[in-house]
Structures are given as structure tokens and as C-alpha cells.
């Protein structure tokens, strides 16, 4: 864990990062509006989308033992289970018995494309994510089957070699009394070199509750962040930058978090070739 220092170099880097976050915040606010419009567009189509996905399915797979990761075993993010503790994809079940209790049901079409994901509770689909393919974009519409509403959106963009370039997730407000509102957005961007995955940038937007924010600030008023000490503007968007390193066999074995207070090196939580 880094220690906060207040050298001129560190202060300048902190200011630069906050300026970057403020600019990214403007982008995320525009994304909020775009994604809210996307929710409104798909909401009247949910039943048809779900029925079409189920009808097109020719094969199913099941998984369990996942924890804290989007879409379970088939999470699009190449980095979440490398850098987040307690985050795991789970495992695919080779056979199904009467005692099997899977977490997810994956539906594939005749082109072997994942077209829907059911989140299961005692074999009942409580949520269904429908995947829509448009050129290099795959949109995931996550539906609450109880009230037929959209609870999450995801967007994956791929390059011509089918490598994922970016992965976005957005949480839709559960307050049905208001117009469609996006509460949280996380955007991951990836770059590659001859070794494989090289860098990841993670941009997170969370619309903070000002009451809770003030309570937290007060509780830490004797241990202020450098941003607070410098009087920098508050920002609902945070930015993280990761560099990945590969061993001689091509596996990611460690990563570095680029930080104004000093870069931090960690061992990858699992070894994988990407």
C-alpha cells in the first residue's frame, strides 16, 4: 500500500489526475444520457427480445460457484478476476443431476454465439440477459423477470481480430417513479502488444449521495486525502491505469497500478494467457 507524500512532483501528478477525472466526468455524464435513451428504446421490446433469444438457442451450458463477477463464467472482462480479490468466474458443469443447483444458464445459437444468460435461483430464471449483436458491438440487456424491467446494460466492442477493446456496464435506477436514470457506469478499455494484453484503463462513474458523502468526509476529516487538502473539486468519476506483465510462457503473472503516489506492483490473482 502506498503512503501519501506531498512532494511537489506528487502534488502535480494528483492535480493532473483530478483534471483528467473531471474531463472524463463530462464524458460519463453524456454516456448517462445516451444509455438512458437506450434503456427507453429497448424497454417496450423486452418480451420479444427474450422470446427470440430463447427460440434461437440450440445448446445450453450451466455454471456455478461464481462470485462478484458480471455474467459469471463468460464475463467479457479479461481483467476483473486478475485484479479484484474474491472475484471468480466459477466453473462450467460437465453434467446435470437432480442435485445440481447452477447459478447460470447460458444459451447459444447455431453460430455458437451466446444469445442469453439466465441467472437462476432453484432453477428459476430471476434475471435474463439478452445479447444483441451489431457488427463489432455486443449489447447486453439484463432483465428483471419479476417486473419485466431493465436493471443493467452492457456494451462490448471488439476489433477485427475479435479481441475485446472495451467493456461497459451500467446500472439502471430502481426508482420507477422517476424517468429512466443511470446510477453507475464502469468502462474498461484494453490495449495489446505482441505479448498480449498490455494495458487496461478503468473509468468508474458513481452518482454520489451528498448526505452520505458529507458523513464520510467528516469521519475522515483528520485523515484527509491529498485531493481534499489541495481543495480540488469533487468528482463522481475515478480513473485507474493498469500495466500487465507476461512471463516467459506468455501468461500474465503480475500487474502494476500507475499511481501519483508511487506505482504499485501486484501478483495476478490467476495466471492466464490473454
Q: What would you call each of these model-derived segments?
A:
Residues 2-274:
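Buried hydrophobic residues that stabilize the cores of well-folded domains
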Amino acid at each position: 500500500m502506498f503512503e501519501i507524500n506531498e512532494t511537489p512532483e506528487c502534488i502535480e501528478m494528483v492535480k493532473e489526475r483530478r483534471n483528467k477525472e473531471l474531463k472524463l466526468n463530462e464524458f460519463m455524464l453524456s454516456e448517462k444520457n445516451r444509455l438512458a435513451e437506450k434503456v427507453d428504446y429497448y424497454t417496450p421490446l423486452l418480451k420479444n427480445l427474450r422470446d427470440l433469444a430463447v427460440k434461437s438457442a440450440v445448446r445450453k451450458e450451466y455454471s456455478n460457484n461464481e462470485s462478484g463477477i458480471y455474467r459469471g463464467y463468460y464475463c467479457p472482462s479479461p481483467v476483473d478476476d486478475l485484479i479484484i480479490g474474491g472475484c471468480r468466474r466459477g466453473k462450467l458443469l460437465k453434467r446435470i443431476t437432480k442435485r445440481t443447483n447452477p447459478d447460470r444458464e447460458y444459451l447459444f445459437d447455431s453460430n455458437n454465439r451466446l444469445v442469453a444468460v439466465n441467472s437462476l435461483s432453484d432453477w428459476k430464471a430471476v434475471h435474463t440477459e439478452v445479447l444483441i449483436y451489431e457488427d463489432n458491438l455486443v449489447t447486453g440487456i439484463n432483465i428483471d423477470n419479476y417486473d419485466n424491467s431493465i436493471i443493467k446494460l452492457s456494451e462490448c466492442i471488439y476489433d477485427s481480430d475479435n479481441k475485446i477493446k472495451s467493456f461497459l456496464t451500467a446500472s439502471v435506477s430502481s426508482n420507477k417513479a422517476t424517468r429512466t436514470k443511470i446510477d453507475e457506469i464502469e468502462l474498461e478499455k484494453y490495449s495489446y502488444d505482441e505479448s498480449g494484453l498490455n494495458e487496461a484503463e478503468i473509468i468508474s462513474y458513481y452518482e454520489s449521495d451528498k448526505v452520505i458523502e458529507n458523513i464520510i468526509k467528516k469521519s475522515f476529516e483528520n485523515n484527509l486525502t491529498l485531493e481534499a487538502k489541495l481543495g480540488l473539486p469533487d468528482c463522481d468519476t475515478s480513473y485507474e491505469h493498469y500495466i500487465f506483465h507476461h512471463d516467459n510462457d506468455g501468461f500474465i503473472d503480475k500487474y502494476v497500478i500507475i499511481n501519483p503516489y508511487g506505482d504499485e506492483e501486484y501478483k495476478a490473482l490467476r495466471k492466464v494467457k490473454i
